[in-house]
Amino acid sequence: MDTPDDLYYTDDHEWLRVENGTATVGITDFAQSELGDIVFVELEPEGTKLGQDDIFGTVEAVKTVSELYMPVGGTITAINTELELSPEVVNEDPYGDGWMIEIELAAPDEAEELMGADAYAEVT
């Protein structure tokens, strides 16, 4: 499993990349592997304010539907619209083109409560 060192991780298998008060969120390589072929992604719209652990969307795979949880609180500033037509990108590139949302962080220090790559590798 791929677990980049520059990201934060949650127990629910979401990742967070923080840059200048904003963050990008997606699901981990482990999560996409466990889900199998992803066939549909539904995300909350831009402008939605959510708290840490709130649901920001769902992914539907051939064998299950899984809810997506906010790793930190914030306001959605962008969604990956490519996933509407090509949800399989999440399977192909979960840390790159398969990103899901970008957020403006409500409390940037919340990210420090999440796991680093080494701790996440122990969970998976």
From Swiss-Prot:
CDD domains: GCS_H (cd06848). Coiled coil: none annotated. Gene3D superfamilies: 2.40.50.100. Keywords: Lipoyl. Residues 22-104 form the Lipoyl-binding domain. Binds 1 lipoyl cofactor covalently. One of its GO terms (cellular component) is glycine cleavage complex. Its cofactor is (R)-lipoate. The modification N6-lipoyllysine is found at K63. It comes from the Bacteria. GO terms for biological process: glycine decarboxylation via glycine cleavage system. Belongs to the GcvH family. The glycine cleavage system catalyzes the degradation of glycine. The H protein shuttles the methylamine group of glycine from the P protein to the T protein. The glycine cleavage system is composed of four proteins: P, T, L and H. This is Glycine cleavage system H protein. It comes from Salinibacter ruber (strain DSM 13855 / M31).
